Structures are given as C-alpha cells and as structure tokens.
C-alpha cells in the first residue's frame, strides 16, 4: 500500500498537471462502490469545479476544489492516479476518470478495486482530518510530541507506528526501516522507550520518510507517480523484505516475525528486545 512518501510524490507530480484546471465532467465509473456520494450526485457536484490545489493528509490525496469542496482519494493497495489522454481510460483496470478542460483525463487505475474516491464538503474534510494523528514531517511533530503519543502505550512500538490515529502516514515499509535505523526492536512496548530512544526514533522516522520522498517512493508492485514513473526507494531498503540477508550495519542475519498481522523485519543483534513494563 502506498504510504506517506508515495502519496506525497503523487501529489507533487500531479500539481503542475492539475492546478488551475477545470473538471468538465465524470468520464468513467465502472466500480460505483469506490465512490462517495452516489454517482449521480457526484457527477452533478464535480462538473465545472476548478482544481485550486493538490495536497495530502496521511495516506489520502487531496484535490482542493472551488466552492469549498475537496476530492479525497485513497490509493489503497494497487491504485495509480495519472493524467493521460482520453483513450487511456479505456484500459481494463481504469475504473474512474474525470474529464479536464485541456482535453486530458485524470484516471484512477486500480487492479484490485480497493481504492476510494470521496467528494467532501468542509465538514467531511474536517472529519477525515480528525481521525488521523499528527503528520510526522510537520514542524510541530517534535520528540516531545512523539513521547506524548506513546505514553502509557503497552502495545509493540511497531503496531503503534502503524496506528493512523496516533501518527499519520507511516505504513509497514517505513515502520520497519525507521525502527532499524533507531536500533529499536519492533516488539518493544511503546511505554518502555527511553527519552534517548524516542529522540532516535523521531529522527529515524523523519529521515526515512524524507529519503523516500527524495527517491520518489518505493515501487514494489503497482505504485507509480502522476506521470507513470516508478520510485527507487526500494533500492535503499535496509531490512524491509530482506529476511535471511545480512544486516547492513552488523552483518547478522535479518529475521522476519509478524506484528499487528504485518510482516516485520529486524536485526536481532542491532535491535535490542525490551521487556514489558509491570
């Protein structure tokens, strides 16, 4: 699933293609379950709207429209959002497309049909914002803010990093990478982290996310940016999906376990196991 760096990359790549453009209509919808509100209401509301800005909240792509509406798009497992020629929307896995005033289309290619497209008013956008934790790259996401989010949390730190209510945008890839960089075992209870470990984790989270954005995200399967280009962050993984390989730091063998129903990769030598608090 695309995480914060991938969605940020898509937003940045779509901005020069979409900002200032007008949506002239709903060109294609063959999977109505992905859409909110109903197709007829959506089509009536979206036509003639000008795209004023493109941004991101957590793993949601946000297209700010005139009239205080926002088009919120979640790529889920296999979604790709591209600006392309109209004939491209006839491809088998394109389930949603919008006509633009320059003759091109914004298309949503989604092989697994898990993606979502929501047209939100101000109240709906506020509700989406409220269910997510702070943005880990924001200026106010300090080590103290991270410590506050983890206070009294006995769940494994890996599970806590995946909780979008606590911290927005981090998924399985970058949780693994951040914990390795910070030398923290993924099963360590959040409440057990020392101030020094929290500082290290804070730095690691921001570092791995920024590095991934610089490298245009991780293209493991379906992910592409708004121009259809692959990212290269997968070439820089230290532990993710590297079970059985040597740790880049100490040469011990990287291991795999399951935490919060997700594959979890770590170095048993570098990442020390902590005990559950009593």
Curated annotation (Swiss-Prot):
Keyword entries, A-Z: DNA damage, DNA repair, DNA-binding, Glycosidase, Hydrolase, Lyase, Metal-binding, Multifunctional enzyme, Zinc, Zinc-finger
Top-level taxon of the source organism: Bacteria
Cofactor note: Binds 1 zinc ion per subunit.
Active site (UniProt): 2-3, 59, 262
Main function: Involved in base excision repair of DNA damaged by oxidation or by mutagenic agents. Acts as a DNA glycosylase that recognizes and removes damaged bases. Has a preference for oxidized purines, such as 7,8-dihydro-8-oxoguanine (8-oxoG). Has AP (apurinic/apyrimidinic) lyase activity and introduces nicks in the DNA strand. Cleaves the DNA backbone by beta-delta elimination to generate a single-strand break at the site of the removed base with both 3'- and 5'-phosphates.
Quaternary assembly: Monomer.
Protein name: Formamidopyrimidine-DNA glycosylase
Name of the gene encoding the protein in the UniProt record: mutM
């Amino acid at each position: 699933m695309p995480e914060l760096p991938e969605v940020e990359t898509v937003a940045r790549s779509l901005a020069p293609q979409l900002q200032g453009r007008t949506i002239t209509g709903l060109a294609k919808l063959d999977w109505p379950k992905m859409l909110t509100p109903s197709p007829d209401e959506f089509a009536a509301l979206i036509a003639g709207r000008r795209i004023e800005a493109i941004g991101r909240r957590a793993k949601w792509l946000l297209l700010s429209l005139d009239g205080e509406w926002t088009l919120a798009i979640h790529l889920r497992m296999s979604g790709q959002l591209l600006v392309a020629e109209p004939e491209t929307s006839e491809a088998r896995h394109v389930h949603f497309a919008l006509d633009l005033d320059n003759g091109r289309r914004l298309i949503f290619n989604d092989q697994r049909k898990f993606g979502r497209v929501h047209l939100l008013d101000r109240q709906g956008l506020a509700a989406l914002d409220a269910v997510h934790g702070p943005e880990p790259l924001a200026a106010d996401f300090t080590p103290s803010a991270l410590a506050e989010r983890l206070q009294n949390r006995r769940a494994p730190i890996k599970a806590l990093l995946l909780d979008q209510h606590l911290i927005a945008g981090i998924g399985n890839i970058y949780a693994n990478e951040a914990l390795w960089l910070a030398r923290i075992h993924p099963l360590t209870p959040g409440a057990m982290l020392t101030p020094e470990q929290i500082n290290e984790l804070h730095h690691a989270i921001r570092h791995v996310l920024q590095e991934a954005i610089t490298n245009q995200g991780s293209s493991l399967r379906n992910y592409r940016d708004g121009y259809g280009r692959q990212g290269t962050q997968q070439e820089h993984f230290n532990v993710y999906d590297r079970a059985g390989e040597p740790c880049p730091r100490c040469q011990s063998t990287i291991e795999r376990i399951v935490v919060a129903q997700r594959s979890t990769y770590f170095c048993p030598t570098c990442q020390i196991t902590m005990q559950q608090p009593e």
